[in-house]
Amino acid sequence: MRLLRPSWAGLLRGRHHQHQRHHRRLLLTTSRGSNGEREEQQHSQWSSPGSRSEQLFYAAFWAGGLTLGYHWLTDKKNHVLLEGQKVASEEELEATARLWHVTNRRELPTYRAEEVEQHNSVEKRIWVTYGLGVYDVTDFVENHPGGDKILMAAGSAIDPFWGIYQQHNTLEVLELLEGFRIGNLEGLVVTNVDDELGSPWSQEPQRHALLKPASKRPFNAEPPIGLLAEQFYTPNELFYVRNHLPVPVINPEDYELEIEGGAKDKTLTLDGIKALPKHSVTAAIMCGGNRRSEMTKVKAVKGLSWGAGAVGNAKWSGARLCDILREQGVQPDETKHVIFEGADLDPTSHPYGASIPLAKALDPRGDVILAYEMNDEPLSRDHGFPIRVIVPGTVGARNVKWLTRIVVADKESDSHWQQNDYKGFSPSTDWDTVDFSKSDAIQAMPVTSAICTPQPGARVKVDDDEGHITVRGYAWSGGGRKIVRVDLTNDEGVSWHVAELEQEEMPDGRHYGWSLWTARLPVSEAQRRAGDVEIWAKAVDSAYNVQPEKFEHIWNLRGVLANAYHKVKVKII
């Protein structure tokens, strides 16, 4: 893409499409030494963007942070760019926004890269650059829960990370970012993101065409919900995919798993893990943001817009973690944690990480395994090949894929995903008052259920003989709690009907797999005449936890733990 310097009125005509057709080019300062040289890193597809990569990576956190902060900063946004201008459509507005950072703002001063670098603390004001723009994000940092990470990006460029964290490259984020602009950057060269970063997405695996992406880079997708209730074990190729970074390429012959924190450290190979006694467990894995799209209807939240399909049920096989840790001399201690790290690395070689209590890891009834098989087949790359830790009954975020390191530690993982993500809050907590350090990381998920068929808006034929409609779905509760009942109503709770359950017979506390259910609901003559029926479903687990009725009562700014009644409107024919 060539540098564009038309007037703002010209920008509003949205003629940028010809420059966006094939790929994005990024603008980097010459003072950063942008020479296109590549440096390979072990276990990673990244190339180094420069000597300040440690700082540059955290620019990605505040790129994501801009999305998080959009809601609390909406009233503070600077709309001066669009004053007096009229945008013909939302598409043209977005077209304009995507040119802001490559356009000189003549009314603003110009700064050299050396000047920007000096603004690297709250005291000196925190400046960052994107393309031709210089931005002062000090006020944002002081209020944002991930401010300590954002601070590490101070005085540097965020350009490389827009090509990686593309889910944040939205109109809202671009508009918010431009509101922080204070000037133009002097002395730029044009660089292709693939040349600069080694195209970390070039070796992504093939996916089934039926998976519906919530984001493409990183790839996150769920199957059509209508397919979920058809089989007790979710087919591997239709199991939802949740990735936070590019999928790593791992040679199984070179694979090693480091284990630390016992009497002595140990390294296991893939063959070494497979030589250990094999154990299998049926377990559902559910993303913490499953059904977030329903919660968003109450009020906007931050996160991928998952439907009810970010869950799957599988038979996982591998070595038991409790056996491995005990062989290492690890003793029970309810105050300790087990940290897991994957091979999916960010540009600074920081891995995805998470942790669980040591008590869960050492409990044979906890069934935590180092899995190398999924439904009797080798793990696919999207699902963690060659080894994924499976923590039954626990939120998907703790089931770390591409496992490379296990550490028994006194504290939880300090990773972003353990400390500043996957946590719940009060409906009254907003981005002005949130404090991630005061909320526990999600472990066991709450009881939930979903209607898989019929789907919203479907035309459903009533059984002529008995006047019923058939409804199918899934139910699950974290912590190994059994689903004891699924109730359905099609008259807003006046009458309830109990579904028939299909589930694995397991001892109490070890019901890690989901339950599929089927119900036949009577349709009254009045409902037939009205033509529309709304079906509600709620599940009850063995602790008699019940789904809440409304999302208004459990809304949280991250959109996690979305387990209110599942409601589907259909047309009766």
Swiss-Prot record:
Its EC number is 1.8.3.1. InterPro entries: Cyt_B5-like_heme/steroid-bd (IPR001199), Cyt_B5-like_heme/steroid_sf (IPR036400), Cyt_B5_heme-BS (IPR018506), Ig_E-set (IPR014756), MoCF_OxRdtse_dimer (IPR005066), Mopterin_OxRdtase_euk (IPR008335), OxRdtase_Mopterin-bd_dom (IPR000572), OxRdtase_Mopterin-bd_sf (IPR036374). Keywords: Heme, Iron, Metal-binding, Mitochondrion, Molybdenum, Oxidoreductase, Transit peptide. Residues 14-26 have a biased composition (Basic residues). Heme b binds at H144, H168. Its main location: mitochondrion. Its cofactor is heme b; Mo-molybdopterin. One of its GO terms (biological process) is intracellular sulfate ion homeostasis. Pathway: Energy metabolism; sulfur metabolism. It is found in: Mitochondrion intermembrane space. Residues 200-423 are annotated as: Moco domain. Residues 190-199 are annotated as: Hinge. Mo-molybdopterin binds at Y240, V241, R242, N243, H244, C287, D344, H383, R388, N399, V400, K401. Residues 424-567 are annotated as: Homodimerization. Expressed in the ensheathing glia with relatively weak expression in the CNS cortex (at protein level). This is Sulfite oxidase, mitochondrial. It comes from Drosophila melanogaster.
